[in-house]
């Protein structure tokens, strides 16, 4: 049921975008400079004629479905009194670095610092290797109780974590419970120090 609802929401969003594209495609011209240069992010829904209210509602609905509804993929837990959270792979009922990093990306974009911090804490506590040749990297696959199912790392997860942490540093600064910039730098250092044999 959970998988069905998630797929239904995603398909609905694609249908909505897909049905609007043919009639409005002429209005959408490529930008000469990207957001990194201009500081402006392109809003395709706005360009397609949707009102700010409609766009905000669609985003809020999607966030609610994934993070707060009865069929959510995000779960909050406490481990030794520390608030943590994880994003469950809906099909396999497990946790992967990909899902964790995607959850953090959504949280930083939606300005949900507590959710972001919970996911990062869970990832560091359960997924990050504390010793051995993969020290500092993350097991890509865990059970929802935190037990690692695969010790190897998947570099996409680490790179997405770095991106999320850099965005969090920019949005929230580094003076709170988590120094996002330092975490990103530490992870980058761990990534660059590996020779590929671990």
What annotation goes with each model-predicted range?
Residues 15-19:
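Hydrophobic core
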Residues 22-98, 109-143:
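Low-complexity, Ser/Thr/Pro/Gly-enriched N-terminal "stalk/linker" regions
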Residues 107, 120, 195-198:
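Active-site cradle of extracellular carbohydrate-active enzymes
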Residues 1-10:
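Bacterial N-terminal signal peptides that target proteins for export
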């Amino acid at each position: 049921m959970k998988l069905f609802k998630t797929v239904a929401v995603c398909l609905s969003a694609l249908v909505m975008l897909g049905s609007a594209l043919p009639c409005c495609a002429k209005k959408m011209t490529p930008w000469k400079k990207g957001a990194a240069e201009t500081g402006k992010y392109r809003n395709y829904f706005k360009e397609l004629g949707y009102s700010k209210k409609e766009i905000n509602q669609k985003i809020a609905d999607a966030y609610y479905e994934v993070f707060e509804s009865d069929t959510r993929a995000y779960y909050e837990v406490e481990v030794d009194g520390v608030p943590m959270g994880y994003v469950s792979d809906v099909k396999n009922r497990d946790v992967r670095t990909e899902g964790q990093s995607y959850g953090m990306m959504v949280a930083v974009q939606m300005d949900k610092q507590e959710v972001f911090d919970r996911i990062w804490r869970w990832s560091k506590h359960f997924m990050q290797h504390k010793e051995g040749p993969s020290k500092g990297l993350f097991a890509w696959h865990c059970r929802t109780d935190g037990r690692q199912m695969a010790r190897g790392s998947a570099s996409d997860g680490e790179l997405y974590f770095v991106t999320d942490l850099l965005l969090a540093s920019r949005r929230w600064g580094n003076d709170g419970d988590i120094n996002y910039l330092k975490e990103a730098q530490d992870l980058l250092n761990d990534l660059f120090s590996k020779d590929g044999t671990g």
